[in-house]
Swiss-Prot record:
Stored Pfam families: 7tm_1
Parts of the chain on the Extracellular side: 1-113, 167-189, 249-266, 442-453
Species name: Drosophila melanogaster (Fruit fly)
Protein name: Dopamine receptor 2
Transmembrane domains' residue ranges: 114-134, 146-166, 190-206, 228-248, 267-287, 421-441, 454-474
Gene this protein is translated from: Dop1R2
Amino acid sequence: MVDDNGSSPEVEGAEGAGAPLLALLRVDGLNQTQTRSPSPSFFGSYNISEDVYFYFNGLPTSTELVLNATTSATSATLSPAMVATGGGGTTTPEPDLSEFLEALPNDRVGLLAFLFLFSFATVFGNSLVILAVIRERYLHTATNYFITSLAVADCLVGLVVMPFSALYEVLENTWFFGTDWCDIWRSLDVLFSTASILNLCVISLDRYWAITDPFSYPMRMTVKRAAGLIAAVWICSSAISFPAIVWWRAARDGEMPAYKCTFTEHLGYLVFSSTISFYLPLLVMVFTYCRIYRAAVIQTRSLKIGTKQVLMASGELQLTLRIHRGGTTRDQQNQVSGGGGGGGGGGGGGGSLSHSHSHSHHHHHNHGGGTTTSTPEEPDDEPLSALHNNGLARHRHMGKNFSLSRKLAKFAKEKKAAKTLGIVMGVFIICWLPFFVVNLLSGFCIECIEHEEIVSAIVTWLGWINSCMNPVIYACWSRDFRRAFVRLLCMCCPRKIRRKYQPTMRSKSQRFATRRCYSTCSLHGIQHVRHNSCEQTYI
């Protein structure tokens, strides 16, 4: 029954009781055969379909229920997000988010749960990185400070940006949190994503400086300089995000559509932000990693060549050789054998090096004849026992050897770090390149993108996958971070489990013991301290 004003008494009673819009629609949709004429106070002049509301509440859609509005028949299916203000001045109750979530179909609920789980994994993994660098002193390096800044940006993406985007996508681009928070959320999305990309760019520059100029790098990359670079990253990211939102709100024509969270599609801003946020950092990263790869190949080749030259001349182990003093291999060999009874041979290789250890250790190398005999009790002691005839020469030579081993170990760690960060860069390109291609294409030719909303959602979440992948890459490729992660994860475990994993971690006392081992070998020349074991402990 409809009164003179065109409104239903049941509806008025429900509205007076403060029932939500979905309940009103449920009351009106009970009689499927009755043709209704809802008043303008319901939907007014809005060309709005009730399909999604009926779908969410298990009611017949417009294909089964004919709705004849007083102004015009509803023909298009729009988003359920709306504020229906009628010509009579009556405002319908605003849709409630909780009711929408309760009425979601199972497939949408599963998608929402998956996206929330993905957001949690991003926050959890990056929080591990942050806590690891804070707790473990051996991770207090300039590179790891940059990685911490990257983890902070990625963690905030998972904490602030992803959950609201998940709701927005699952509810078919419906925004329930107001216009102000929409603008803030969009600006934070730009801020954190740009900061993540720029941090990767700074990390690539840091690795480039460390590998191409390793001697001056420790003096150049101080804590203050690292803090300055991190501050520059966040200031630049803020300059791209927040002022643009202020400009966007001032230049926007009219009010933002109700229950929508749109962002500027101005071509100038899209080109500017994409260039600063992605394309320039991408060029810098590609350039630096190409140079890093070339430098690593050259240094690795030179180390191998230098080691082989000394191996052919003296027959010693690799870590006791190759000293950069400007001299030749013959000079280095004479330094080792010059003070004892061995008698260093000339360049023709006819000489021999022999000695007798106090514990019946003996070995003989005949370079000319090509024969080698060895009768040691402990073969691993040969590199040290071969030098015991001349204490001063042994002391100098071992000091050089240990210095070389430290350089080799440091270079190996630098090269592995560069490889790890190269993988990070590759994942970064795969994740973010589609988004910025679509971002620019939407400014030039939005019609060229079929199913634009679906494509935008896919490439956006693909970019956010990068924030979740970085901690996984650190755990898989960085032994230091892997140790720190195990420590953190075992803190809540029983003491037996913590003790089980404790020997696999290099503690502070173990690092000091390693240094004492090198000091003892260098100063006192103890014959039974194995060179190889010292090196393995150090590395």
